[in-house]
Amino acid sequence: MSVLTDLIYGGSHAVAGLTEGAVNDAIAKFGAEKAIAFPDTAYFFPTIYAATGVKVAKLGDLPACVGVLKSLITDQEDLGQALNAGLATAVGAEIIEGLKYLDGADPYAAETGIGFVPDPVIRSLGVPLVTGDIPGVAVVLGKADNAADVVSVVKDYQSKGILTFLIGGVIDQCAEGGVKMGLELRVVPLGHDVTAVIHAVTVAIRAALIFGNVQPGDLPGLLKYTKERVPAFVNTFGAIDNVVVSAGAGAIALGFPVVVDIDLGENQVPGALESVLDHSLTVKRSLELRNIKIKTKELPIPVAFAAAFEGEIIRKADMHTEYWSGKNATAELVLMRDPSEIEDHKITILGDDMDGGEKNYALCTFIEVAGAKMQADFESVIERKIHAWFNYMEGVMHTGQRNQVRVRVSNDAFAKGLRLKHFGEVLYHMIMDEFDAVVDKCQVTLITDEAAAEKFRDEVAMPRYNERDDRLLSMTDESVDRFYTCILCQSFAPAHCCVVTPERLGLCGAVSWLDAKATNELNPQGPCQPIFKEGCLDERTGRYESVNKMIQEATHGAVENVTLYSILEDPMTSCGCFECICGIEPVSNGFIVVNREYKGMTPVGMTFGE
């Protein structure tokens, strides 16, 4: 037996023994009928459920699962068989972690890690994953010989928007090294025990069930989906024992390559298990192994800029400056201009900068753009991006839109030199990068003088908002000559396609008809393609020949017919990025609507997840 397979089998046998003993002890203490479950999930023990279809609901269900686990450990001198033993380790880790939640326990209450990741969190990751705001998932475990190495790697992942899970001593090393952590910052500590790695694994597995329509019990389908659709990888730091190696084999079986920082010599498996001893190359090689390409944005600002900072919360005690509509005039407005009316890259500040000595200021953000292909309909599309772009700056928190805005700047960001001119630079560079197909010139004006801000809000911004609202209210499905497809989610749900109309947003809620129109203008070969309204077959249900034809093409034949307005006749497809489910309750001949946050049973006998 090779050194590598010997380590894998040694680890899987150790975990199998621990698992069997833990299950027997739990049954002896609580009885076989004792209920067991992970919190806030509809997928039971997700690894077991996805791989076998077994719904673990009580302790008495676990001995059979242990039997399946042990059957995967064959001790054969074959790498494929050894990888199956790695999957057995994953099953064992899931059972061991699940037992921690027995009797309503909260095993991570006193831990730095969060433990099990609830279903709503995974569903909330759907949109950023498919849009590329989260380009990949890193699982970092162990304890680095030099804490600075893992801190540097994790900060690099964070700056690139990679969702990073931490397991083991690296959690404390990153905390001490100043890494900002939390679900909202995309660096998530899971737990110190090596078995906590299963909480990262089940995120990938539930993604297959939620977004990919993989059926429970379809192990080949699950492995195919995670390998092809979930851009995850593993980094280990420090010495590794046979349990870590076996857990790594389970990751490789799911299609996730493993990069270690010790020399494995001839035990390396190119493309799957590799040694990278120079930590400055760890990130680069990890991304290469999953073919993750990241478009870096070098902006002339003194703080980091990444999607990972979008969820950063700035408390009042940590705040240097606030721009808030509750105290001062605020507005955000984009207007189309003739090219002769504006000066490209001109950034003007009317009033005091944030170093003027006050805590609270007015802030009206006025962006003027010009371009041969620019349309007034695109103004609001660009405007809504201000929220994301401001939040991408480390140390900046933005909420709201239009004339109801709150922006906070942290003491730390101010100390690093962040000023309003940098806000203008961010807006200019991001508009010219993301909207270069329609914008040729852009100038930015930031107004902090209270009188000037009030005048701008009342005389310029509000009338324009009202004009847009009046137009949107008059826009119906009948008033346009085309709809749009949206297949952004096909990276996770390959048979899904939305039909976006003026009266029907994309299922995720993030793509309006105007968004789809702008997306098509910006990228004519992209995810949003026009569907000209031709061949109306049924006005009542919204059935069109042209829509059916486009749906067939977009779903590669998986879906042949769609209606726009019927819940019973060929309703539109869905993936997992929705907030609510609407269904029919036959007894009362009525409809029910359930949101994903609701954890209870619905009148139709199913939970949201079911």
Language model segments and positions:
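Cysteine-centered metal-binding/redox modules
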Residues: Y9, H13, E20, N24-A32, ...
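Acidic, serine/proline-rich low-complexity intrinsically disordered regions
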Residues: M1-H387, N403-V407
